[in-house]
Amino acid sequence: MPQLVPFYFINILSFGFLIFTVLLYISSVYVLPRYNELFISRSIISSL
């Protein structure tokens, strides 16, 4: 099982951390602000 070999384990952990960091950055910069604007606009429209 290559997942338990230390070299592959470190490789899997490092790439997993890298992918997680990139996805977190992309979602916080591009995806979440759009949902925030949508939520704010819907709350303003519903309060009219």
Curated annotation (Swiss-Prot):
Cross-referenced InterPro entries: ATP_synth_su8_fun
Gene Ontology cellular-component terms listed: matrix side of mitochondrial inner membrane; proton-transporting ATP synthase complex
Keywords from the UniProt entry: ATP synthesis, CF(0), Hydrogen ion transport, Ion transport, Membrane, Mitochondrion, Transmembrane, Transmembrane helix, Transport
Self-association and partners: F-type ATPases have 2 components, CF(1) - the catalytic core - and CF(0) - the membrane proton channel.
GO annotation, biological process: proton motive force-driven ATP synthesis; proton motive force-driven mitochondrial ATP synthesis
Membrane topology: Single-pass membrane protein
Top-level taxonomic group: Eukaryota
Gene name tied to this protein: atp8
Family according to the record: Belongs to the ATPase protein 8 family.
Compartments (UniProt record): Mitochondrion membrane
The protein's name in its UniProt record: ATP synthase protein 8
Reported function: Mitochondrial membrane ATP synthase (F(1)F(0) ATP synthase or Complex V) produces ATP from ADP in the presence of a proton gradient across the membrane which is generated by electron transport complexes of the respiratory chain. F-type ATPases consist of two structural domains, F(1) - containing the extramembraneous catalytic core and F(0) - containing the membrane proton channel, linked together by a central stalk and a peripheral stalk. During catalysis, ATP synthesis in the catalytic domain of F(1) is coupled via a rotary mechanism of the central stalk subunits to proton translocation.
One example GO MF annotation: proton transmembrane transporter activity
Transmembrane segments: 4-24
